[in-house]
Regions:
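Metabolite-binding pocket within alpha/beta catalytic cores that recognizes anionic/polar moieties
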Residues: 2-144
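Conserved small/polar residues in nucleotide/adenosyl-binding loops
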Residues: 146-148
């Protein structure tokens, strides 16, 4: 308990170099740090908060709501580090964005796709949930993303 408390007492998280108050409770997660500024250009008053290793963070507002964007690097282990540290300092809703291939001919490069599930064939997520637990977003999240 005291270890968790010390992580929240104004100390920066080791990898992301952020502390409580640096981020919004809604965080967008691209993999590539180069995409952070591309996303943040849509914010009002974007401010770079930290850039350490593959973890770059900008916080601003979008349509009147405080939003942060933090890059996670490549792969599940580095994403898990970012997500755990962001959760330690107040992130409540995290949305992973990125590129993907398409299996349907009608899906074109640049199309916006909201996944309603994912295959968990990697080694990180079983450390958090049994493989039988489905990797699906909440219906509220999907509907919110559709309306953005």
């Amino acid at each position: 308990m005291s270890e968790k408390k010390s992580m929240l007492d104004g100390e920066k998280q080791y990898h992301i170099q952020l502390k409580e108050g640096d981020i919004a409770d809604f965080v967008i997660l691209p993999g590539d740090p180069g995409r952070v500024d591309f996303i943040a250009q849509h914010f009002d008053n974007p401010k770079e908060i930290a850039f350490n290793r593959e973890y770059k963070t900008v916080t601003g507002t979008y349509k009147g709501r405080s939003v942060s964007v933090t890059s996670t690097g490549i792969g599940c282990p580095s994403a898990a580090i970012a997500i755990e540290e962001l959760a330690n300092i107040g992130a409540k809703t995290l949305v992973r964005i990125g590129t993907s291939g398409a299996m349907q001919e009608h899906t074109r490069v640049g199309d916006f796709v909201i996944a309603n599930g994912a295959v968990r064939q990697e080694g990180t997520s079983p450390q958090y949930m049994p493989m039988e637990f489905p990797a699906v977003p909440s219906a509220d999240m999907v509907l919110s993303l559709i309306h953005i």
